[in-house]
Design a protein with these regions (language model features):
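PAPS-dependent sulfotransferase catalytic domain
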Residues: 80-132
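PAPS-dependent sulfotransferase catalytic core
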Residues: 1-75
Length: 132
């Protein structure tokens, strides 16, 4: 399977989308050069978050510009998993601006997601910064 340059990846907080992201990033051809010790959050026995997350007030805003997005990765080669809760609000723009890239959305029922999000730390997590 030929991977695109980017996969725009989104899910609600608590949907365990970050765990799915980590599984996808084990595939051959994925670029994980966005991972640094500062871009990691561990809770329970999980490394809950790894790599860059795009969002309002975060290190990288959810700006749909290829040069802006790509600067989060050290290496240019390989498929980049571009993670943001905000992509769900911009699906048409993503499809228009990045027609050859993929969009993946993770679904999990709302109350189950809400409960897991709070168990994993909610707004109090260290990375990424979700404080309002």
């Amino acid at each position: 399977m030929k991977l695109p340059e980017r996969i725009f990846f989104t899910g609600v907080p608590g949907s365990r989308w970050s765990g799915i992201a980590q599984t996808l990033e084990t595939m051959s051809g994925m670029n994980i050069s966005d991972r640094t010790p500062d871009r990691e959050y561990v809770h329970h026995s999980y490394t809950g978050h790894k790599g860059v997350y795009f969002g309002p007030g975060m290190e990288f805003e959810p700006i749909l510009d290829s040069d802006y997005i790509d600067q989060a990765w050290v290496e240019p080669q390989g498929c980049k998993l571009v993670k943001s809760h905000e992509w769900a609000y911009n699906l048409n723009q993503i499809r228009t601006k990045f027609p050859d890239d993929w969009i993946v959305m993770v679904y999990r029922p709302d109350m189950i997601s809400y409960a897991w999000w709070h168990e994993a730390g909610g707004f109090a997590i260290s990375y990424p910064d979700y404080r309002p």
